[in-house]
């Protein structure tokens, strides 16, 4: 099983190289000018980031299984049940965190961080007018979710706030459960 997993991780790493080349190639299709620097496609940048996230997650998961396999036989039934519950409770937060990271690819790809580099407001607005326009008619403006500078920046910020709240929720759940010391430490990080 480990050999198959490592082979899969190697294949992911190799494909990451090809995706990186594909991403960079998108920035070289149009020559740079004084007014327009070289930029890569936000879609390709986010694909490259997603593959890196998948590869990192796979390597981390594999390493954790090798270094610290969890043995439910050495803990009470209540601790084992609480550990399984906490793992399930943490999944939505993990998904939100990953979506937040991937939305950062669109922020970087659209260079939205340079346009809206104030906090907590976005320049002078809590919600820029372009965001309201996009969400009021999403059927016609759906591409703005990925290509509009104010929209990708606003979405990334809202996802980041949601990530923080979900992390606090997992922390609150973990504090109230009987867990192994290692599991408690991991949950409270």
Pin down the residues of each PLM region.
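Polytopic transmembrane helical bundles with strong interfacial aromatic enrichment
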Residues: 1-189
């Amino acid at each position: 099983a480990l050999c198959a997993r490592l082979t899969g991780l190697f294949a992911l790493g190799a494909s990451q190289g090809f995706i990186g080349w594909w991403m960079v190639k998108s920035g070289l299709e149009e020559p740079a000018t004084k007014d327009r620097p070289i930029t890569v496609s936000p879609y390709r940048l986010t694909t490259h980031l997603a593959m890196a996230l998948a590869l990192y997650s796979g390597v981390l998961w594999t390493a954790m299984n090798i270094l610290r396999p969890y043995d439910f036989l050495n803990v009470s039934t209540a601790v084992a049940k609480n550990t399984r519950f906490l793992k399930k409770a943490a999944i939505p937060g993990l998904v939100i965190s990953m979506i937040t990271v991937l939305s950062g690819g669109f922020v970087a790809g659209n260079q939205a961080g340079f346009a809206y580099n104030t906090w907590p407001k976005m320049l002078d607005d809590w919600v820029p007018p372009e965001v309201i326009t996009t969400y009021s008619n999403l059927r016609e403006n759906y591409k703005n979710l990925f290509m509009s500078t104010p929209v990708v920046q606003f979405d990334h910020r809202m996802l980041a706030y949601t990530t923080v709240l979900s992390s606090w929720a997992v922390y609150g759940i973990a504090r109230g459960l009987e867990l192994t010391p290692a599991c408690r430490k991991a949950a409270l990080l």
